[in-house]
Amino acid sequence: MKQLITITTILFTSLIFSLPSWSESEVDLVEIKLLNNLDDKRGFCIDIKGHKLRAKISRGIQAHTCYSYQGEIAVDQGLDANKLKEKKLFFPYFDVCAHPTSSKNPLNLNLKKCGSTEEFVFSEDNTIRLKNNTNLCLTVAEGNSRKGGGGSPLHLIRDLSMKTCNQQNSVYKTWGVRGFKKGKIFIKKISKLTSN
């Protein structure tokens, strides 16, 4: 009986330590952050609507206070860095990619299983554009942010959609990639992914 308890304890401990810690797993997680912090010093990141593990992929994406100030990248903001190099916005925890809702109305994005084609172009001006319509950029809503349901100070939320690219109001359209490397935070402009 004692051996059975010991074996069970070892197996349980092995299982616990083998579960993925999404910030430190074999998937290199990063967040995509608006380069301008706007009205939140923590910045705005692409985020699945809902709360972390309980995010609702059917509700789509938004711009939300970046969670990395808490010391790790949250699963509802964590994108696979290797898939970004393939021009895909892939959230590995939920196994979904961002896609235009349709070719007729590409202004909104939804989340679904990844396809084999690239959906986005990361431009030299640090914008994220649709591959099949490079006149449209991923854009954070202007105006005042809405208050979220958590955080201290409260997290802030803004709508996110594809809008016409232009230099006017570029602070709402320019993006960077941020993550952790050897325990230290790094950020680089989205245009740096074009060289890969």
Range-by-range predicted roles:
Residues M1-T8:
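Bacterial N-terminal signal peptides that target proteins for export
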Residues W22-K33, K56-Y93, N108-A141, G148-N196:
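Exposed, tryptophan/tyrosine-rich binding patches on extracellular proteins
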Residues S25-K41, I46-I48:
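An edge-strand/N-cap motif at the start of beta-rich repeat modules
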Residues K41-L53, Y93-K104, N133-S145:
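Extracellular/lumenal glycan-associated surfaces
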Residues M1, L34-L38, M162:
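Detector for methionine-enriched segments
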